C-alpha cells in the first residue's frame, strides 16, 4: 500500500513537472547575469523601478499622455509608483513594456500582480520561469540565454551581443558589459 501511494505521488509530481515552468532551477549566476544585463545601473547600483516602453510610437504616445518618458524609459520612485504607472499604460493600450530589474515583458509574460515585476524575489522567480521555458524549447546554450532579452531568432547579432554580456559577467570580464541593448 505504501509503495502504491509513493508511486502515485511520484507519478503526480512528474505530471505536474511537465507543465510547470519552475521544475528546472537556473543557476543563480545565470539569473544574476540576466539582472546585470537588464537592470538600469545608476550610481553603480541596480534601479529596479524602471519601465521600458519598447515601441517608438507607444513611447511617444505615453509622453503625449503626460508620462515622464525619457527616450523609452520611465523611472519611478518606488515599486508602488511603477505598478500604478504600468497599470495606467496598460489601461491605455500600451502593453509592450519591460518591467523591473529583470525587464520582464508584460505583453508576453502578463501578470496581474504588477508589483511583482518590481520586487526582486518575485521578478527573479519569473525570470527563472521564462529561462526554463526557453531552455525546454531550445536547449541549454548561450544562444538560448540570449533569447531572454530578444526572443526573435531572426536577429541573431542582437542575441549574440546580449549573451556575450552575460558570458563576460559570469566569467569576470564585465568592464563593458553593463546595461541592456
Kindly label every feature range from the protein language model.
Residues 18-181:
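Catalytic glycan-binding domains that act on GlcNAc-containing polysaccharides
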Residues 1-4:
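Positively charged n-region of N-terminal signal peptides that target proteins for export
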Residues 8-18:
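Hydrophobic h-region of N-terminal signal peptides that target proteins for export
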Amino acid at each position: 500500500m505504501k509503495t502504491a501511494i509513493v508511486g502515485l505521488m511520484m507519478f503526480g509530481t512528474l505530471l505536474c513537472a511537465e507543465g510547470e515552468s519552475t521544475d528546472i532551477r537556473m543557476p543563480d549566476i545565470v539569473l544574476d547575469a540576466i539582472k546585470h544585463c537588464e537592470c538600469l545601473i545608476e550610481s553603480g547600483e541596480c534601479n529596479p523601478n524602471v519601465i521600458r516602453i519598447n515601441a517608438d510610437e507607444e513611447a511617444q504616445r505615453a509622453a503625449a499622455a503626460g508620462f515622464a518618458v525619457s527616450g523609452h524609459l520611465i523611472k519611478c520612485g518606488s515599486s508602488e509608483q511603477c505598478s500604478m504607472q504600468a497599470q495606467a499604460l496598460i489601461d491605455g493600450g500600451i502593453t509592450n513594456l519591460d518591467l523591473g530589474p529583470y525587464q520582464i515583458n508584460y505583453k508576453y509574460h502578463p501578470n496581474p500582480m504588477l508589483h511583482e515585476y518590481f520586487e526582486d524575489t518575485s521578478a527573479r522567480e519569473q525570470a527563472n520561469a521564462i529561462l526554463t521555458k526557453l531552455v525546454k524549447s531550445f536547449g541549454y546554450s548561450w544562444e538560448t540565454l540570449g533569447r531572454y532579452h530578444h526572443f526573435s531568432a531572426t536577429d541573431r547579432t542582437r542575441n549574440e551581443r546580449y549573451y556575450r554580456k552575460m558570458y563576460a559577467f559570469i566569467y569576470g570580464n564585465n568592464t563593458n558589459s553593463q546595461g541592456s541593448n
